[in-house]
Amino acid sequence: ICSTIEELNQIFGSKYVQSNTIKGFEQFNNKDKFVVIGTPCQIDSVRRYIKKRKIEENFVLIDFFCHGVPSMKLWNKFSASQRNKIGNFNSVTWRNKVDGWHKSYRLDIIADSGEYHHTGLKFDDFFNLYFSNAALSPACFDKCKYKQDQSSADIRIGDMWGADYSKNKEGVNSVICFTEKGNKAVKEIDCTIKRHTFEEVLSGQMNFLPIRDNFFYRLNPLIIADSENWNEITTRFRKMFLKKRIMRKVKSIIKIFSKK
């Protein structure tokens, strides 16, 4: 829980793993005001918790358009591999926009020694595993009920993709208010607001459940297994990914020649 701007800055930035919220729950009370931000399933749990304790009025709940969350085991294995390379670290930033909003798929790590490391989407196995859906939690597939406009939050946020902002380098946020409390909170913020239809906002988001494909069934057992390390997982993934790219290329060539 943050109570100052300085503390808030420490958690600034996109995250691709869920936060451990147990200590946060322990500090909830009926005297202070809280803004809680988390994945849609986390926020649903918070809503149930505060509703049962009749302290909802003290809270503004915010979730976001969620692609899904990877297994914590995958993150732990990735972290261990990074520590072997650069030593201990306590600063990780996802989606750094130093090169612009549209080129923000990068991972930045600052080691305790002060050494700075970063990789882009093209070369980062964690990002590629994440976007292949192979590393997502099983609950994100057939049990997620928080896509599109399904939410227990007051406000949902995300990136505002689309042709209108294709040349914008700073980034544009989409904000959807589900409750009057959320609407009031957004109106009190000193920012520029431009209205869009819900369909326009949704068009740039993953609004359907991910599909369990061959990547998931072959890689997920390795991710879960304590005996498999990061290098073994990524080696298998790269081989599968290369095979898939080759198959796509062959199919596209066949499709081109079949039209002639």
Regions found by a protein language model. Give the residues of each.
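Iron-sulfur-associated redox domains of electron-transfer enzymes in respiratory
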Residues: 1-260
